[in-house]
Amino acid sequence: MPKVSIIVPVYNVEKYLEKCLNSLINQTLKDIEIIIVNDGSTDHSIEIINKYLEKYPNIIKYLYKENGGLSSARNYGMPYAKGEYMAFLDSDDYVEPNMYEEMYEIAQKENSDMVECDFIWEYPNKKRYDNGIIYNGKEEAIEKARVVAWNKLIKREIIEKTKIEFPFGLRYEDVEFFYKLVPYLNKISFVKKYFIHYVQRNNSIIATQNSKTKDIFKVFENVIEYYKNNGYYEQYKEQIEYSYVRLLLCSSLKRMCKIGNKEDRKQALEETWNNINCNFPNWKKNKLLKNKGLKNVYLRTMNQYTYKIYCSILSII
């Protein structure tokens, strides 16, 4: 059994794919499997994949499917994973050579259900180092974790037993996947090293703001429904409420303000405020808002009047 299975969805990334695959082939942890899921690419990605398949047939599995998006490709690859731990890597990103060895060693040492590392936002002309908070327990995971999937090593049996998948056709797929997993993560560990280069492209999903930005509403609706149906909601309600409000009024709101179509932008901003106050009418009383930090100061000052002011400011910066 491989130690780590790495699922790599591929869609029209011929400019980036070799760097991504080289970073995986050259891992110091040798007992890995790389599962490439070709999500219906129409560029020269397949020629690059075939070159690596021919050279490394023992560690690369190749799967093809019709185009369905990032979540669909990840979900398609998961049943083929045989490793003790599972990881995800987007095919325009790349990793440091010792990443999976060091994360796997910590997982073994601490019997971890999940291991998380830090990463670098890599822009054409600059880099930004993302140094995450070390959080303790499930409550803090919901409250403080970076919800991206690709900086984590996750025990495969947890994913298999829970049957948790990425939501089809929605942005913010990592948000739903991570929050659904949290109740089953009894031990979370950290490697405080910048292992992943998170490459920023102008035409990437995250860089393009449109009406799909509103998918965050459906994603959190799915999370809340899952927690209620599985008996976790009352236990984690405070954290879910706080994370919902923080995400919608911070990073998500900034994206909403950048929606190009004026009517779509106006509707998205109205829906954001209405959704928050409909789902959590007493959110201003959430005890987690009392914690220190600039984001909490910002959230505590938020009301129906300041909301419009903040939206106006975010639209022009």
List the predicted regions and their residue ranges.
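Nucleotide-sugar donor-binding/catalytic module of glycosyltransferases
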Residues: 1-221, 225
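Generic hydrophobic, helix-prone segments enriched in Leu/Val/Ile
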Residues: 6, 85, 110, 216, ...
